Every structure is written in C-alpha cells, then in structure tokens.
UniProtKB/Swiss-Prot annotation:
Any one of the GO BP annotations: amino acid transport
GO cellular component entries: plasma membrane
Organism name: Mycobacterium tuberculosis (strain ATCC 25618 / H37Rv)
Subcellular location: Cell membrane
InterPro entries noted in UniProt: LeuE-type, Lys/arg_exporter
UniProt keyword Transmembrane helix, yes or no: yes
Protein name as catalogued: Putative amino-acid transporter Rv0488
Length: 201
C-alpha cells in the first residue's frame, strides 16, 4: 500500500511544498492522515464494492481525475512561468485557513484519489473479509508514516529552494508529472480485484 502513497500526485506535491516552506507541516500531515483514514474506512466498509458495481462511477472517477490532474498541472505551469512569492522569506507565511482549504481540495476534490484509496484498497481489504479492518489499519498506518516522513523531511531541502528559480524548476517538474499521470489514468483501465468484494458494513 505504500506504493500508492509514494506515487507523485497533487496531495503529495502539496505536502512537499508545505514541508519545504516549513509552514503548518504538523497540521497538514495530520489533516492528510485523517482524510486518508476516512477514505480507507469507506473503502473497507463497502463503498469500494458499491463503486465497482457501477462502472459509470469508475468512469467518472477516471475522467474526472484526469481533468483534475491536468488542471493542477496548468496551475503549476503558471507558477513556473510567472512565479509570485515563491520564496518563503520573501512572501511570508500563508494564512492557515487558505492552506487548509487547499489541502482539502487536493485531497477530496481529486476524483482519482477515490480510485486508489477507496476502490483499490477497499477491494483488496475485502479479499479477506475477516481481516479487512486489520488490512485497512495497516494501510492507514503506512499512509500516516508516509505523510509524516514527506512533510517533516522536506524541510531539509529548504536551502536548495532559497531562490525563485528553484521553485520554478519544482513547479515545472510537478506540471510535467501531473500531465504524465493524467495520461496514464486516461489510457489505463483500472484493475480491481473482484473476488469476495461485497457490501460488508
């Protein structure tokens, strides 16, 4: 399950950025951990089976996720092309409410996250229904560890991001990566284990 979290996505890119800036890292890590816990619980509890039983919902998640990723890529590309207040020492800390709102956006308004965190983890957990909640707990623990490591270790990179040019490079890389992930989402049919997947609350 750690491979799902390590994959580059809008949420990880956002946590990385906040970690480098050393702004509200604990709040963001905690928020991402709680959100993932809720999504994993939904999948393990049976929501994954509900989505899997309705192919149209999966289709919406695929194309909606790709659209979200492309939109995020365009925002990153804009920041890379026309940087504004990228260096923490120059721009000052962002408002907490704005940071929290952005964290919620990249977490819950990205349809692709529901394919990974809800559908895939939920389906895998229900392969062994008696142990599904232990599986979910393990997946959640891995998620929390990943966000903590990413957020708190990213601060060590701050010296490398002391100039706007470094942030422009990061945003450019994020933009290219998001486009690549969007293409993969569009051309790859989601493969979800189906055996023993049932609505078990």
């Amino acid at each position: 399950m750690m491979t799902l979290k390590v994959a580059i996505g809008p949420q990880n890119a956002f946590v990385l950025r906040q970690g480098i800036r050393r702004e509200y890292v604990l709040v963001i890590v905690a928020l991402c951990g709680i959100a993932d816990g809720a999504l994993i619980a939904a999948g393990v509890g049976g929501f994954a089976a509900l989505i899997h039983a309705h192919p149209n919902m999966t289709l919406v998640a695929r194309f909606g996720g790709a659209a979200f990723l492309i939109g995020y890529a365009l925002l990153a590309a804009r920041n890379a092309w026309r940087p504004s207040g990228l260096v923490p020492s120059e721009s000052g800390p962002a408002a907490l409410i704005g940071v929290v709102q952005m964290c919620l956006v990249v977490t819950f308004l990205n349809p692709h996250v529901y394919l990974d965190t809800v559908v895939l983890i939920g389906a895998l957990a229900n392969e062994e229904s008696d142990l599904r909640w232990f599986f979910g707990a393990g997946a959640w623990a891995a998620s929390v560890v990943w966000f903590a490591v990413l957020g708190f270790s990213a601060g060590r990179l701050q010296p490398f991001f002391a100039t706007p040019a470094a942030w422009r490079i990061l945003d450019a890389l994020v933009a290219v990566t998001m486009i690549g992930v969007a293409v993969v989402v569009l051309v790859t049919s989601p493969s979800v284990p189906t055996a023993n997947v049932a609505l078990i609350i």
